Amino acid sequence: CAGTWHSDQPHEGFHDCQHRSAEHRDFCYRQRPRVIFSRIIPVGGKQFNESICNLNRRKNNFQIGSKTAKRVKIALADLGTDKKEARKVRGVDGASGLPMEGIITSSLVNEALLSGVNEIGEEIKHALERTPPQIHDHIQKEGIYITGGSTRIPNIDRYLSRQLGCPVQLSQYYDLCTICGLKELITHDALHRWAYTVNKKK
């Protein structure tokens, strides 16, 4: 979350940051340069991809890999419109175990994503319910910023905004937050004590 400070974002507010190899999200409230509140949400891009793989296997009886799931997630998902598209992909037949081609639709991808997106929304709502009134008022005005690769899912900001009842905005620097966070740790006095050099193993 420390890496989300950029010119396009306020110096304080709630941020939903995907990290840890896309396995988790870190939902935090920050006042530069400090992170005041942080909560781990065990949902990230990896879980979204696995959900697409699992639902496709159950409904279409053929298996696809996580890389294919990631591609169709970006190509077919849309949480704001009733998108009607499909892609032909290669996978493995669930009965014979042989390579095959199959069709994955946008409706299947959206269905697979919604449970994870809803879980993120519910966790954020629970956190907002426990925030002091002055912070809650600030969030209602400034909104929440989302970063990480899942920000590329079309209309995820609008979907979460309807669920949360506050503005949700996408960071323009979703793919650089880890690097920028390391920069914050190194260059800011309040965070510098958390930085250390990793010793090489002998």
What positions do the PLM features span?
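Short, charged, intrinsically disordered terminal tails
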Residues: 187-202
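Phosphate/ATP-binding catalytic cores across multiple sugar-kinase/actin-like superfamilies
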Residues: 112-140, 185-189
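Conserved phosphate-binding catalytic cores of ATP/NTP-utilizing and phosphoryl-transfer enzymes
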Residues: 1-17, 183-187, 191
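Glycine-rich phosphate-binding loops at beta-strand->alpha-helix junctions
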Residues: 77, 81, 136-160
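Residue-level signature of catalytic and energy-coupling elements of molecular machines
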Residues: 18, 52, 124, 146, ...
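Phosphate-binding glycine-rich/basic clefts of nucleotide- and phosphate-handling proteins
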Residues: 31-118, 129
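Gly/Thr-rich phosphate-binding beta-strand-loop-beta motif of the actin/hexokinase/Hsp70
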Residues: 8-35, 83-84, 154
